[in-house]
């Protein structure tokens, strides 16, 4: 059947380049939905994000994802919204930017550092105590698994009008993620507790520069974590 799958998302905004979440995520999906209606294409899958919400104090990324969901829900389309947690993996093998590669490049290899010394990787914490540093978790899921679910959902009429959350089989903390990436790339790291409000303030000044590892939006979402249980979903589709 004819269908539209809207995957466009913008992890980090650069307004001076015209790259904003409102433009590419919200307005883009809204426009494509209207085009689909005009062309008589009824089936529409929207890739949203786990944690999408209208909170004005939240990230612009999650706000835009929420607005996209509302636009699709208000359409006449046979829609399904899919909300994955953090994705990893490059299925085409073309070394395009992806979660783990970007962490390795922008955090573990941002500045020259002797390989024989443990690299001080930031482990963010909120509040006054550093004992919870880096414990926020993600249900990371491979992009190939998400693609497989999209294919299954496309022909599953029971998912029409539904919102589906997608996450990996286990929760992985920030500290575990960084240590795993370092191990896979032959590096040695130690997790250095870093006050979130300090890093967040610095990002407010520097996130306009592409070389800076993360913007305030990304930090807001990271510190909240992104966790769900999709065991039954994977079981249903035999993935």
Enumerate the predicted regions with their spans.
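Oxidoreductase cofactor-interface core, primarily capturing Rossmann-like NAD(P)-dependent enzymes
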Residues: 54-172, 179
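Mid/C-terminal beta-alpha module of Rossmann-like enzyme folds, strongest
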Residues: 147-214, 228-239
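NAD(P)H-binding glycine-rich loop region in Rossmannoid oxidoreductase-like domains
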Residues: 1-39, 50-55, 154
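A short helix->loop->beta-strand "cap" motif at the edges of active sites that frequently abuts
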Residues: 38-43, 75-77
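Short alpha-helix in the Rossmann-fold core of NAD(P)-dependent oxidoreductases
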Residues: 22-29, 45, 65, 139
């Amino acid at each position: 059947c004819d269908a539209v799958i809207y995957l466009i998302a913008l992890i980090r905004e650069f307004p001076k380049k015209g790259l904003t979440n409102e433009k590419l995520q919200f307005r883009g999906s809204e426009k494509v939905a209207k085009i689909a209606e005009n062309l008589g294409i009824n089936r529409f899958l929207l890739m949203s994000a786990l944690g999408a919400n209208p909170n004005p104090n939240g990230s612009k990324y999650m706000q835009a994802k929420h607005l996209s969901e509302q636009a699709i829900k208000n359409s006449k389309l046979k829609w399904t919204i899919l909300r994955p947690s953090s994705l990893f993996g490059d299925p085409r093998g073309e070394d395009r930017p992806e979660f783990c590669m970007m962490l390795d490049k922008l955090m573990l290899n941002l500045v020259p550092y002797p390989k024989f010394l443990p690299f001080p990787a930031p482990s963010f914490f909120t509040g006054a105590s550093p004992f919870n540093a880096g414990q926020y978790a993600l249900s990371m899921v491979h992009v190939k698994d998400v693609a497989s679910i999209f294919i299954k959902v496309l022909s599953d009429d029971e998912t029409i009008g539904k919102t589906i959350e997608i996450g990996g089989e286990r929760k992985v903390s920030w500290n575990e993620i960084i240590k795993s990436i370092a191990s896979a790339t032959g590096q040695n790291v130690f997790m250095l507790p870093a006050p979130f409000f300090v890093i967040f303030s610095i990002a407010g000044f520097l996130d306009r520069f592409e070389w800076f590892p993360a913007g305030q939006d990304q930090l807001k979402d990271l510190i909240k974590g992104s966790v769900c249980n999709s065991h039954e979903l994977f079981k249903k589709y035999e993935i």
